[in-house]
Curated annotation (Swiss-Prot):
A GO term for molecular function: structural constituent of ribosome
Protein name: Large ribosomal subunit protein uL16
PANTHER family, alphabetized: 50S/60S RIBOSOMAL PROTEIN L16, LARGE RIBOSOMAL SUBUNIT PROTEIN UL16M
The keyword Ribonucleoprotein belongs to this UniProt entry's keyword annotation: yes
Disordered: annotated span: 1-24
Biased composition regions of type Basic residues, renumbered to the chain: 1-17
Its biological purpose: Binds 23S rRNA and is also seen to make contacts with the A and possibly P site tRNAs.
A Pfam family of this chain: Ribosomal_L16
BP GO annotations: translation
UniProt-listed CDD domains: Ribosomal_L16_L10e
Family, similarity comment: Belongs to the universal ribosomal protein uL16 family.
Species of provenance: Mycobacterium marinum (strain ATCC BAA-535 / M)
Length: 138
């Protein structure tokens, strides 16, 4: 699982999700990429599930890059707890994804298999996304 080794503060505020991604919007390492089309918090489990889906489909001969990292903790209070008495304990680690951000990159010689693998990964993610290539970037 992807989690930070050490953080300065255990709990953070939840900012509003607005704006578009300013960096990380192009395919730099691989030939194909998954680009987000909307705002979302992507958890470390969803990132890992998408990575496994890609690797199982391409088997061997390709390389996968993960361009996001879950560095923000989300907290949750236990079930059937009264209001008040502070903020809940950290439950998940999430990556704050903005529209335009490239989440995964893939290098693979066969385009049809690469697109099928990335489509499987998109189904594991909680956002609308599209597949882009190194040539067709906006």
């Amino acid at each position: 699982m992807l989690i930070p080794r050490k953080v300065k503060h255990r709990k953070q505020h939840h900012p509003r999700q607005r704006g578009i991604a300013s960096g990380g919007t192009s395919v730099n390492f691989g030939d194909y990429g998954i680009q987000a089309l909307e705002h979302a918090y992507v958890t470390n489990r969803q990132i890992e599930s998408a990575r496994i889906a890609i690797n199982r489909h391409i088997k061997r001969g390709g390389k996968v890059w993960i361009n996001i990292f879950p560095d923000r903790p989300l907290t949750k209070k236990p079930a059937e707890t009264r209001m008040g008495s502070g903020k809940g304990s950290p439950e998940w680690w999430v990556a704050n994804v903005k529209p335009g951000r490239v989440l995964f990159e893939l290098s693979y010689p066969n385009e049809a298999i690469a697109r099928a693998a990335l489509t499987r990964a998109i189904h594991k993610l909680p956002i609308k996304a599209r597949i882009i290539t190194r040539e067709e970037q906006f």
